[in-house]
């Protein structure tokens, strides 16, 4: 992508004098100079980022009593086209500064294209990026050029969505996140449905995203069929909300899979029928059900709940009765596995992180725009998914004992 620089960034011929050029005796001299120049440019760009982060320039009186200030810098080695260089990375006193042009945990500065995509991933519009590039980095890029760059994200998202998947996942959590999207001239709610799988090495992986107007078992049938077409042969445990018909849909595509309905969703659903003054006590009584040591004790606690509250809130109890078998699947497993399957907290936490990246967007112009933004958010989030889940060694041994014929080591 060719960038258009401001006129003042073009090196005039009068600067390239014989006197200036005489300092370079070898190609190594030129390379050393360019490395130093590259480092100085990055340093200036980082200073511009810090100015924008704090809202005032260095040594400005505007920073007095602002609540945050510069706090020196730390040296960082980076790789340039001309070799390794050390540049100072500025810090702020509150520890909130996140450099963009030289990202944390990376040893290379971003290219212009990657810089634009990084800004786009943070929820900035094309016009916002154009202004940011001009004011902070002093780089002139037209909005059309920025659009061309961000449109490449759509192709990358499609390739990611269609990539092959592992044949077996130990657990797959399923949930959705709602966005405002323009559709036929109207702003409506649409849901991006996500599946997160637990791999046989203990790492989490987002398997895909699907956009729909409303959740239904027929919709999820399409999602599960897509997973199978991309290579998934077996899912040991699925964790879902209590959508009517969802469990049967899963069994149609993955007949051996055990499905656990999210207990937290069930608690919220029951509490809808309970008046505010009783909710605290009612919720405490419900905890006795899912904190029970086994299914038999849990059933007795449900009976106790019904004796105490059934006359006043029959519908709050009825939903437990109607979904009992799918709500209590987790009792079949050891405690370490129970903790990660009886709720969809893992994927709800993921949704919360996506919200942080998309909070500046009140609505999206199209489904594709939503997909691009969520895809970029997921790529940023997955960078931190580098370690197996807690107690992984113990959990894997438990899975191998319980599902020894279905796990391929």
Where in this protein do the model-derived segments appear?
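Active-site phosphate-binding and catalytic loops of NTP-dependent enzymes
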Residues: 52-64, 68, 155-167, 179-184, ...
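Basic, short loop/linker segments at the boundary and entry of helix-turn-helix/winged-helix-like folds
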Residues: 67-122, 138-148, 167
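RNase H-like nuclease fold core
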Residues: 90-93, 100-106, 139, 143, ...
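DNA-recognition alpha helix
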Residues: 127-138
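Conserved beta-strand -> loop -> alpha-helix junction used to position metal-binding or nucleic-acid-contacting
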Residues: 237-244, 249-285
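Subset of Sec-pathway N-terminal targeting signals
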Residues: 1-72, 79-82
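Acidic/histidine-rich catalytic cores and adjacent linkers
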Residues: 255, 288-409
């Amino acid at each position: 992508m060719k960038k258009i620089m401001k006129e003042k960034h073009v090196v005039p011929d009068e600067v390239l004098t014989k006197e200036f050029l005489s300092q370079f005796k070898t190609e190594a001299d030129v390379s050393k100079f360019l490395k130093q120049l590259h480092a100085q440019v990055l340093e200036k760009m980082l200073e511009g980022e810090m100015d924008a982060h704090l809202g005032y320039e260095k040594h400005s009186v505007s920073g007095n009593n602002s609540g945050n200030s510069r706090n020196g810098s730390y040296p960082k080695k980076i790789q340039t086209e001309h070799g390794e260089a050390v540049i100072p990375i500025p810090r702020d006193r509150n520890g909130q500064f996140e450099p963009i042009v030289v990202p944390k945990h990376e040893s290379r500065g971003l290219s212009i294209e990657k810089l634009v995509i990084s800004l786009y991933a943070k929820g900035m519009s094309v016009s916002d990026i154009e202004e940011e590039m001009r004011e902070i980095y002093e780089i002139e890029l037209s909005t059309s050029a920025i659009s061309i760059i961000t449109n490449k994200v759509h192709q990358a998202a499609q390739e990611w969505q269609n990539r092959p998947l592992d044949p077996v996942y130990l657990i797959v959590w399923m949930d959705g996140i709602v966005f405002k999207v323009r559709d036929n001239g109207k702003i409506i709610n649409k849901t991006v449905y996500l599946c997160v799988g637990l791999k046989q090495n203990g790492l989490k992986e987002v398997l895909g995203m699907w956009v729909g107007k409303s959740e239904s078992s027929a919709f999820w049938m399409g999602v599960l069929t897509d997973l199978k077409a991309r290579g998934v042969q077996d899912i040991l445990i699925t964790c879902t909300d209590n959508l009517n018909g969802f469990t049967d849909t899963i069994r149609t595509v993955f007949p051996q899979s055990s499905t656990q309905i999210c207990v937290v969703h069930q608690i919220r659903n029951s509490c809808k029928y309970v008046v505010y003054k009783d909710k605290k006590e009612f919720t405490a009584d419900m905890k006795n059900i899912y904190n029970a040591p086994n299914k038999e004790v849990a059933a007795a606690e449900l009976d106790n709940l019904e004796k105490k509250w059934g006359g006043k809130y029959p519908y709050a109890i009825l939903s437990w009765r109607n979904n009992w078998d799918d709500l209590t699947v987790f009792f079949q497993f050891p405690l370490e596995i129970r903790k990660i399957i009886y709720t969809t907290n893992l994927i709800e936490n993921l949704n919360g992180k996506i919200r942080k990246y998309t909070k500046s967007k009140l609505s999206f112009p199209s489904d594709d725009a939503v997909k691009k933004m969520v895809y970029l958010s997921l790529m940023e989030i997955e960078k931190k998914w580098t370690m197996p889940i807690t107690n992984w060694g113990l959990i894997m041994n438990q899975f191998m004992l319980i599902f020894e014929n279905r796990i391929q080591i």
